[in-house]
């Protein structure tokens, strides 16, 4: 009887999602019914829990702790990658399951959009070394392997105002693509969840609505990371746009440049916060005019 009531509740919520947003949502209540670690294990490539001794992970460097896990630079399957490790406890199974699914989807986008890192695989690990554990009560840990990015935006500085603008322009276009393809909402865009990677590419291309938009990189590519608060399906784009506007203002404040250059950054991003959606923001010429190569 109880399960029947829960099923009716879930169906009602999914119907509400469809009425409000036109689709269901990955993070809806149905995901909360994952009862054990096997819900996550089934989504990994190995399909089984792997002892640490068999994981064959070579730790090279500790990168940092975040709210949802710990990151290391490692060698795994003959590749130098970033390993994010998160303890699995009953209350986190649903969240980690969804994060893994979204990370896999976003990883595929990296082939056509440089602002997302490639996904290399995942395993559920048992017997994690004690020195790597944040919660001793977690028997198993989820390890997600991603491409190695750059410097956290919060620690990054520049004296070239054009770099500040290209960061925002690239992120807007990347989010437009992700939103178009999978109705992606990051949910936690802020300075610590954006990496700045150096590049030798002078420009990069984005394919949107059958058009190719070419943007100057000025030697950098911003990359979005951490999908622990992300979801797909519903489409409240204003959530991410508002957060990106906050990031834009902070990047402008941190510019090691003249007052004139800081004003140029402010003018380029001032309307970001007022945009209704990513499509609307992509039409904002003030943001793109100093970094766009061509639009055809």
From Swiss-Prot:
Xref: PROSITE patterns: PROTEIN_KINASE_DOM
Organism: Caenorhabditis elegans
Keyword flag Cell membrane: no
Membrane disposition: Single-pass membrane protein
GO cellular component: cytoplasm; membrane; nucleus
Gene3D superfamilies (UniProt xref): Transferase(Phosphotransferase) domain 1
UniProt keywords, alphabetically: Membrane, Transmembrane, Transmembrane helix
PANTHER family: INTERLEUKIN-1 RECEPTOR-ASSOCIATED KINASE, SERINE_THREONINE-PROTEIN KINASE HASPIN
Protein name: Uncharacterized protein ZK177.2
Coiled coil start-end: none
GO biological process entries: intracellular signal transduction; mitotic cell cycle
Membrane listed as a keyword: yes
MF-aspect GO terms: ATP binding; histone H3T3 kinase activity
Compartments, record wording: Membrane
Superkingdom of origin: Eukaryota
Entry's transmembrane regions: 1-21
């Amino acid at each position: 009887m109880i399960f029947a009531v829960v099923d009716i509740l879930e169906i009602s919520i999914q119907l509400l999602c469809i009425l409000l947003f036109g689709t269901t949502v990955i993070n809806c209540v149905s995901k909360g019914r994952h009862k054990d670690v096997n819900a996550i294990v089934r989504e990994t490539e190995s399909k089984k829990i792997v002892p640490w001794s068999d994981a064959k992970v070579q730790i090279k460097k500790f990168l940092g702790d975040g709210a949802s896990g710990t990151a290391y630079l490692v060698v795994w399957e003959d590749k130098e990658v970033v390993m994010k490790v998160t303890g699995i406890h009953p209350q986190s199974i649903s969240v980690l399951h969804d994060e893994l699914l979204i990370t896999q989807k976003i990883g595929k986008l990296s082939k056509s959009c440089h602002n997302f890192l490639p996904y290399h695989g995942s395993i559920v690990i048992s017997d994690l070394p004690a020195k790597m554990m944040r919660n001793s009560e977690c028997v198993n840990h989820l390890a997600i392997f991603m491409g190695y990015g750059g410097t956290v935006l919060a620690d990054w500085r520049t004296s070239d105002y054009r770099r500040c603008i290209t960061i925002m322009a690239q992120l807007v276009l990347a989010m437009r693509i992700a939103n178009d393809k999978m109705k992606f909402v990051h949910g936690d865009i802020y300075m610590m969840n954006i990496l700045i990677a150096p590049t030798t590419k002078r420009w990069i291309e984005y394919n949107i609505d059958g058009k190719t938009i070419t943007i100057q990189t000025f030697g950098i590519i911003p990359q979005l990371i951490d999908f622990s608060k992300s979801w797909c399906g519903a489409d409240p784009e204003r959530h991410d746009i508002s957060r990106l506007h906050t990031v834009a203002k902070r990047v402008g404040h941190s510019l090691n440049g003249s007052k004139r250059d800081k004003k140029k950054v402010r003018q380029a991003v001032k309307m970001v916060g007022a945009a209704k959606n990513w499509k609307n923001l992509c039409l904002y010429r003030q943001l793109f005019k100093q970094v766009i190569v061509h639009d055809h």
